[in-house]
């Protein structure tokens, strides 16, 4: 599946528990993903990510993701926030997979392919990098419907 290209990939400063943290933001139209190295918060990463999402919500767009990324293990745990509606740990995140792929390609300044283990299975990103920019992102993976119904908000 061809995915949209990021508008920008940049380092942003955040504060949590009086600690200033510099993290990579991958900005797409409609969602911004913040890459959080799993090693930053260790065993408490999930709880800290949930708290960070609530604290940082006022300085981020209405829809954003905090991506707990373990580069060594090539794993991703996506937490996605929709302002005033939800804060959900997703089993798989296509835009998050794209964000990690775009970040790695931009950092390495070359085409990359990465497979990311996520709670619901493995997703793959193939990213083209040319002339100083990400020029193409494609993702693949298995998708299954795990619930059906009507949501009343």
Features from the language model and the residues they span:
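Active-site proximal loop and beta-alpha junction motif in alpha/beta enzyme cores
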Residues: 1-92, 98-153
């Amino acid at each position: 599946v061809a995915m949209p290209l990021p508008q920008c990939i940049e380092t942003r400063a955040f504060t949590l528990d009086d600690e200033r943290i510099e993290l990579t933001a991958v900005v797409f139209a409609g969602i911004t993903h913040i890459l959080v190295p799993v090693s930053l918060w260790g065993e408490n990463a999930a709880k800290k990510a949930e708290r960070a999402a609530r604290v940082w919500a006022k300085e981020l767009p209405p829809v954003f993701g905090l991506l707990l990324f373990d580069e060594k293990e090539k794993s991703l745990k996506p937490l996605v926030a929709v302002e005033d509606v939800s804060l959900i740990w997703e089993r798989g995140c296509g835009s998050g997979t794209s964000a990690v792929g775009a970040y790695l390609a931009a950092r390495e300044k070359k085409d990359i392919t990465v497979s990311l283990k996520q709670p619901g299975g493995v997703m793959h990103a193939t990213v083209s990098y040319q002339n100083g920019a990400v020029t193409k992102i494609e993702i693949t993976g298995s998708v299954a419907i795990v619930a059906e119904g009507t949501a009343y908000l």
